[in-house]
Curated annotation (Swiss-Prot):
Described purpose of this protein according to its UniProt entry: This enzyme is involved in nucleotide metabolism: it produces dUMP, the immediate precursor of thymidine nucleotides and it decreases the intracellular concentration of dUTP so that uracil cannot be incorporated into DNA.
Alphabetical keyword list: Hydrolase, Magnesium, Metal-binding, Nucleotide metabolism
Species: Nitrosospira multiformis (strain ATCC 25196 / NCIMB 11849 / C 71)
Gene that produces this protein: dut
InterPro entries: dUTPase (IPR008181), dUTPase-like (IPR029054), dUTPase-like_sf (IPR036157), dUTPase_trimeric (IPR033704)
Superkingdom, taxonomy of origin: Bacteria
Protein name: Deoxyuridine 5'-triphosphate nucleotidohydrolase
UniProt pathway: Pyrimidine metabolism; dUMP biosynthesis; dUMP from dCTP (dUTP route): step 2/2
Any one GO molecular-function label of the UniProt entry: dUTP diphosphatase activity
SUPFAM superfamilies, alphabetized: dUTPase-like
Source lineage: Bacteria, Pseudomonadati, Pseudomonadota, Betaproteobacteria, Nitrosomonadales
Positions that bind substrate: R68, S69, G70, N81, L85, I86, D87
EC class of the enzyme, as a word: hydrolase
């Protein structure tokens, strides 16, 4: 298992570091490091601190901040930016944009799990300018072109 540097910015997390829930989990839960219960009204979005900072340091890695499926499905709480991208050289606190797309106010409790962090490999590329591409089977056929079923 690869190790990355983590900085605890909120002392309440000392005993609750992000961890994989099961041996097959891809995401590490991120928590809302807020002092009091916060009400997120329908249509509102708030930046929520997670109380941690990470430094991946390896340009071959990035981290994705993804929504928790239960919050979105049951309560309409999703990420305002849909997906967060943390570059390998970022060292600041991780924040989560929580957007209430539901119809009812949502009460966010201190230290509630609000998102997942997934570390992924990254390939940096360069571009070679060409006049034409070698023909592929699909070509330029886009949206819906591969069929419905």
């Amino acid at each position: 298992m690869k190790k990355i540097d983590i900085k605890i910015l909120d002392s309440r997390l000392k005993d609750q570091l992000p961890a994989y829930a099961t041996s097959g989990s891809a995401g590490l839960d991120l928590r809302a490091c807020i002092e009091h219960v916060m009400t997120i009204q329908p249509g509102e979005a708030h930046l929520i601190p997670t109380g941690i900072a990470i430094h991946l340091s390896d340009p071959g890695l990035a981290a994705l901040v993804l929504p928790r499926s239960g919050l979105g499905h049951k309560h309409g709480i999703v990420m305002g930016n849909l997906v967060g991208l943390i570059d390998s050289d970022y060292q600041g606190q991780i924040f989560v944009s929580c957007w209430n797309r539901g119809q009812a106010p949502f009460l966010l409790n201190p230290l509630e799990r609000i998102a997942q962090l997934v570390v992924v490999p990254v390939v940096q590329v360069g571009f070679k300018v060409v006049d034409d591409f070698e023909q592929s089977e699909r070509g330029a056929n886009g949206f819906g072109s591969t069929g419905k079923h």
